[in-house]
Design a protein with these regions (language model features):
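Generic structural signal for helix capping and beta-alpha/helix-loop junctions
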Residues: 82, 108, 199-200, 231
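S-adenosyl-L-methionine
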Residues: 1-148, 154-158, 207-237
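Short internal loop-to-helix segment that lines adenine-nucleotide cofactor pockets
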Residues: 28-52, 111, 129-186, 198, ...
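Short, glycine/acidic-enriched loop or turn micro-motifs at the edges of active sites
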Residues: 56-58, 79, 107, 168-170, ...
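Active-site micro-motifs of SAM-dependent methyltransferase domains
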Residues: 24, 107, 151
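Conserved beta-strand signature within the Rossmann-like core of class I S-adenosyl-L-methionine
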Residues: 187-194
Length: 237
């Protein structure tokens, strides 16, 4: 049985987490963990929102989105982290996420993509591992499911996002490129964690060009922070 303990993320957001996550020192340091980004999300997400959380990792931030009143669609390719989700959702008295997608949000679709509506994927039955690493699209895109956000909305009838959060370690343009129709039609708010070095290394792409492309779709940009990555917020102009 996983030990769940109370944590206060960035000195502000209280929730129950598996002990190894609650014990992360970054939550309690003055600079916090992605503090301006999380504060911006808290200020702009609430009841009636549908958040597509791309790169959900172990689930703290999307769980907070749901605690603030939003519905969430989770994208996470790493099978080793899904076991954290039921423990966190149950301990915080949350309803099941609207949709779980154990794969990559991408700019293409493969035959491995799976969608679970109001249920957990089978990956949740694995043992919780504290050290799990990441899955990266450019290396393992053919190993795990890929689906576009546009396909989620227009082919599968999932509620369109009012907000998209993505932290994908270099594959930012793959995600947003696969959401172009949704971005043009619905103008969801976007929290983008940009990794310029990874984008260049993995895809020979420029974060600057992605930023200009996004603004060209009718968005205004706010730079929230730059720590280990640059945190950007976009809203309809």
């Amino acid at each position: 049985m996983t030990e769940m303990v109370k944590a206060v993320l960035n000195g502000e957001f209280e929730m129950m987490l598996p002990k190894h996550r609650a014990d992360r020192p970054e939550w309690y340091e003055q600079q916090g963990w992605e503090k301006p980004r999380l504060k911006s999300m808290h200020q702009n997400i609430g009841k009636g929102d549908v958040v597509y959380y791309v790169g959900a990792e172990e689930g703290e931030f999307p769980a907070l989105c749901q605690m603030w009143g939003a519905e969430v669609v989770l994208f996470e390719p790493n099978p080793k982290v899904w076991s954290h989700f039921p423990a966190t959702w149950t301990a915080n008295n949350l309803e099941l996420p609207m949709v779980c997608i154990p794969g990559f949000a991408s700019d293409k679709i493969n035959d491995l993509s799976r969608i679970y509506y109001n249920e957990w994927p089978p990956e949740v039955n694995d043992v919780i591992e504290a050290a799990h690493g990441f899955k990266e699209l450019y290396l393992e895109g053919d190993t795990y499911g890929q689906i576009t956000i546009d396909s989620c909305v227009y082919d599968h009838g999932i509620k369109p996002p009012t907000a998209i959060s993505l932290d994908v370690e270099g594959s930012e343009w793959r995600v947003l490129g696969g959401a172009e129709r949704v971005l043009r039609e619905y103008k969801p708010k976007i929290w983008l964690s940009g990794h310029p070095e990874f984008m260049l290394q993995q895809w020979d792409e420029s974060l600057y060009n992605l930023r200009q492309w996004t603004k060209g779709l009718g968005y205004t940009e706010t730079i929230l922070d730059y720590q280990h990555e640059v945190h950007l917020y976009y809203e309809s102009a």
